[in-house]
Every structure is written in C-alpha cells, then in structure tokens.
Amino acid sequence: MTDYRAFHLTVIGASHIKNGMVCQDFSLSCELPDRRISVVCDGHGGADYFRSDRGSRFAAEAFTECMKDPDLISVLSAAATQKQQSLRIEQLIKSIIARWNELVEQDIKEHSFGEDELSGVSEKARKRYETGQRMQSAYGTTLIGVILTENFWLGLQIGDGRCVAVSKDGEFTQPIPWDEQCFLNVTTSICDENAAKEFRFCFERTLPAAVFIGSDGIDDCFAGDERLYDFYRLTLRSFAQTNDQTAVSQLKDYLPTLSEKGSGDDMSVGIIVNTDFARQKPTVFEKSQQAFQNEVTP
C-alpha cells in the first residue's frame, strides 16, 4: 500500500467569506498499513440546517470510524457474488448512518437548540424541532467517501458532488451512479429518513491510478465533465512533477481562487493516488494543456 497516498483539503467559499458564513464543508483522510481512506462532506447550510457545519464533521468522522473497522477488509473481500457485496455494503452504510445519528444525538444532548438558532428557521422546521422530531435535520449533510485496499476499492455517496476515478490507462470515469434527485440546490442527505436507500456505491477489484472526490463547490465551477476531468488531470500532473506536499499545497492555494472565479461555494477535495505510478507514467495524464483559470465557467 506504500505506493498509494491519501489526502484531503477543505477551504471556505468566497461567498461564505463575503456573507460572514461559516464553512459548511468538512473532509478527512487516513492512511493505515492495509488501507487508504478519504471522505468529503458538504453541510446543507440555510436556516433550517443551522448545525450542518457540525453535521458534515460528524459524517466524516462516522465514515472514517467505520472504515477503520479491523474486520471490514476481510468481510468485503470474502464477498464472492454481487449480491453478497451489496448486502455487506448495505450493512456498512447502515452502520455509518447509525454512527452519525449517535454523534448528532450526543451533540444535541450536550448543546440543546437555542432560541438564537431557532429564530430563523421555517415554521414547519421550528414545530418539528420544538417537539423533538427529526432534530437531526438541523445537521443535514452530503457525504462522499472512498476506501482503497490491496484487493478492492469502495466508494460510497449520498447527495451531490462527484467521485472521479482515473484508470491506469488514463481513462476518467464517475463510477458511483448519479442520483437524479440531486438537481440544482436540491440534494439527498444523510439526515433523510430513507437515507440508507438513497446511498449509492461502487465496488471494484481493479485498483485505479487515482480517485478524486469533490463537494459540489468543485464541480459547479466547470462547464461539463470534461472540464472537471481536466482539472483533476492537471492535479495528477502536479503529483507527477513535484513531491506530494508541494502538489497538495499548490492545490490548496488554488482552491480559494477557483471558488472566487467559479461557484463561490465551500470546496472540499479528497484524493487517493498512486504517486509512484503518477511519476513513472506521467504521459498518461497529459491530454490537456489548459491552465486552471481557463477551466472555470464565467
């Protein structure tokens, strides 16, 4: 596993800075001897979701905790059929949701909703929260997470944002099925009552050269998938041409500019990349020569 590295980046959006809003995104990554983990979460924001910045952090923590389960790799590796894979992944999804709800419930217990938080919510949400119903909605967030091991990689998602996988032939794909319920500002959420059924996933035995996961603040900057792929292609070229720390630093330094010129939203990127492959086969990622600033929509 030493040839794969895991990274995560989150920056506050330009519009959030302008309007005095907190960052709603949260991301984590982890490198263990037998696995690499990365996750990005995007809290919904808005008056009814007044604790979604905490919700995104709890979602990232819940995902990471579940991915660290010592038995997880053997359980998923032993799944011989697609049906077995689906059943075990569905159980994993339920565990993530349950852990997120535990973290939310503990936070509510320690920090009850205040009048300053409830004053701006809709009448419908206020009635619900004041009667103790669906209080986790205040923490609503999306989630995209990836785990990569020696034998497989798994991607899980609820809500918007994009997971982009790059094969060792240089092909860019989005292996997690898209949810048509996610459109414009509407998205599914880990706080939904039927969240377990709304999760999508991909399970692959062939390891990629890299996997990128990005909150919708990233993909909303680009006019189509090919422009998004060019952005990640240039990121891979950075890994090929410099050391890991420099590549990540360059990306983090650029994201505020991307937000300002593009979506204005918070931005999170998770990366799991075979850095050895990127440096040994850099020409695989040289399809585009366009600069970042030419890739953002007006």
Q: Where do the PLM segments sit?
A:
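N-terminal entry segment of metal-dependent catalytic domains or homologous docking segments
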Residues: 1-68, 161, 192-202, 263-270
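PP2C/PPM family metal-dependent serine/threonine protein phosphatase catalytic domain
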Residues: 6-21, 114-136, 140-141, 165-206, ...
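Catalytic core of PPM/PP2C metal-dependent serine/threonine phosphatase domains
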Residues: 77-164, 199-205
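C-terminal catalytic subdomain
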Residues: 185-298
